Each structure stands twice: as C-alpha cells, then as structure tokens.
Amino acid sequence: DFSKFERGYKKLDFPAANGNFIFYTIADLNKRKNLQAFIKAFHAEFDPSEPVSLLIKSSKYGLPPEETAMKIKDMCNHIKRGLRKFPDVNDYKEDLIVTDFISEEEICRIHRTCDCFVMPSYGEAWCIPAFDAMGFGNTPICTNIGGMSDFIGDAGFLIEGMMEPVHGMIDTLPDLFTANESWCSVSVQGLMDCMRHAYENRDGLKSMKKTGLKRAYDYSHKNIGNLIKDLLNADN
C-alpha cells in the first residue's frame, strides 16, 4: 500500500526527544538484527548534550512487551558500561524503547515521527521497515547486504562490513544460522560516520529523500508486474 507514504499521520510524543533528531530502528529482538551495533554507534558518536535521540521499536515472539523492554534496556546499559565514556550509565542519552504490539498505523506514525532509519543487521532478504522508511523520506543507513543493497541505491547510505561465520542465533531451527554459513558484520565506525553526516547535513539530504520516494514506487506491484511481463514476453 504505497498510499501510506502520502497520508498525514500525527507524530508520536516522546518528551525526552522533544525537538531532537531521532535515529530509529524497527526490528525483532534477535542476534541477526545486530541492535548492539546501532546502540554502540549512537552512544560512541553523539554527546548527551547534542539534540539527538535513539529509538528502538522491537518485539520478541513469546515474550511479553515489558520483558522485551527490560532485555533491551539491559543491552543498552551493558554497551554504555563497555564504552566507558562516562562513570554512570545514567550520564548517557536516554534510550527510547517501544515494545508494545502496535498497529500498522502506529508503525507509520513512528516513521513520521523519526528522522533517520538505521538497520545494521548481519543479513536481510528484503527488510520491510527499511523500505518503508525510504518511502517516508527517512534516509536509511543500512548494512550493504541482501535486498537493502538493491532497493536503497543512492537513496540512502550502505555501510560495508566483513563476512564472518554466523554465531549466536540460538532461537531458530537447528540446521539454520550455523557457523557453516556466513553473514556480514557491519562497520560500527561506518555507522558512526554516516549517522553524523545525516545529522549535520539535513538540508543536503533533501534530494536523497526525493530519490527514496521515487525508488520506493519503482517497486510497486504494477511496476514489478510489468517488468515480469516484459521478461516473459522476451522469451517468446
């Protein structure tokens, strides 16, 4: 439904982020999504005095929202302690964590509220949230892997990484996501650099946002259907 990109959505109210530039992600809570890289890059790059915020919308199958929120908060605090920039984790910028099960309209409100989408995952087939963020004009910053490499192009930032054996995917089928496979570990420094650039060059990203909306429409059912029809006709 591409019309959602053009609808008016009321922005959500996050008092701690009032007036801030918000980096955000929408992702399941699992190892493949690599939320740790996003959290580390944000708090390593930005000082608490800067008007920027981090928002994580996440959920985990079979886990109540409040437990999911606690797991993410513990993850954030563990990373902050490891960064050792400040003596207390409370000295860092407050993280915005949303774990309630919400409607598609509420997801669209998150896109409309935030400014720059970040997906540092180890691998993606497509990544619907990144595609939708691009359609909403929220310049995506993503690992250069999978479907994101195809649809983002020059409408966002694709960060290189290193291929390494899969590790830590314990909540899946026994024959999937083993060390016999490889995935891409994104450069945290690359994330930091692109997040800084997006924050400091908002006016310069306007053309990129327009490109993102155009590229989103390139993948409409109609356009893809016509492409498939042309390919089938070419074989006749």
Segments (PLM) and residue ranges:
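Conserved donor-binding/catalytic core segment of Leloir-type glycosyltransferases
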Residues: 15-33, 39-42, 54-56
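Short hydrophobic beta-strand element within catalytic cores of glycosyltransferases
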Residues: 139-142, 157-160
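Nucleotide-activated donor-binding/catalytic signature segment of Leloir-type glycosyltransferases, i.e.
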Residues: 65-108
